[in-house]
């Protein structure tokens, strides 16, 4: 296992290369300990700040198939930032080492951490579509106004491609930051009030499905645009689940744009899909 850490505020960096014993039960805790110890040795603080973190885990199945989990994210906390850093890495290591499907031989783990004291965070204030009428399959530009911490507001433009199967009529879109969960509360409330479309019968999930969940999970530094409701029966039928996990995964139309900072907040817009 190799861990590289940079404290950008102090201009200090360091790394550690450690050989881990082959023990599925202990692998997650060893990964957590090596990461945390390396970070604390270089950063030498327990305060707040922003962390950029990326990692990859390579493994091999019993049948010789190559397995890879690769992930990056950003975190911010006003205190205890170091304890947040290894959570996703430990989750990924736990999946590979202790999954119920098959034995995975993990042979490489790499992690890179960059820490800073500044809060690299901006909140979505508003969102405005550049046009109010779009066609199915057309790309829609959305201007998103953001308020950073103790700085002037600015605007970023993100793109959303209208699903080809989207029926004519009003289409509500939710524009949110990857670190925001306020939209989730509103969605669950709306589902309770309006009823939830019938879902497909859940399919049996495989290890590859769980790996894909980690590799494709939302990042805190993304602006995410998704259809805010599922009035279209064709799209609703594609949802295999209607609970919290499915809401977090979003609809098949969800699209993401990566930013160089953590994005919080949410905004809703409405456009007309024409025939």
Q: Each PLM stretch: what is its role?
A:
Residues 1-275:
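Long, low-hydrophobicity ectodomains and other hydrophilic envelope-associated domains
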């Amino acid at each position: 296992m190799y861990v590289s850490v940079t404290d950008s505020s102090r201009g200090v960096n360091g790394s550690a290369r450690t050989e881990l014993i082959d023990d599925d039960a202990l692998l997650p805790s060893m990964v957590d300990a090596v990461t945390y110890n390396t970070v604390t040795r270089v950063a030498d603080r327990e305060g707040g700040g922003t962390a950029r973190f990326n990692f990859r885990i390579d493994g091999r199945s019993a049948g010789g198939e190559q397995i890879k989990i690769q992930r990056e994210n950003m975190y911010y906390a006003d205190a205890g930032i170091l304890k947040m850093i290894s959570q996703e890495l430990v989750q990924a290591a736990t999946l590979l080492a202790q999954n119920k499907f098959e034995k995975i031989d993990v042979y490489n783990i790499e992690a890179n951490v960059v820490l800073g004291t500044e809060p690299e965070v901006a909140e979505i204030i508003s969102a405005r579509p550049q046009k109010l009428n779009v066609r199915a399959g057309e790309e829609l530009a959305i201007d998103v106004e953001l308020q950073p911490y103790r700085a002037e507001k600015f605007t970023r433009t993100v793109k959303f491609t209208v699903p080809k199967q989207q029926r004519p009529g009003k289409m509500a879109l939710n524009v949110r930051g990857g670190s925001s969960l306020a939209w989730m509360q509103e969605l669950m409330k709306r589902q309770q009030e309006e009823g939830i479309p019938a879902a497909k019968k859940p399919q049996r999930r495989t290890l590859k499905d769980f790996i894909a969940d980690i590799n494709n999970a939302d990042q805190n530094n993304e602006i995410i645009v998704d259809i805010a409701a599922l009035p279209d029966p064709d799209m609703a039928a594609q949802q295999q689940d209607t609970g919290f996990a499915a809401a977090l995964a979003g609809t098949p139309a969800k699209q993401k744009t990566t930013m160089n900072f953590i994005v919080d907040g949410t905004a809703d817009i409405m456009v007309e899909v024409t025939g």
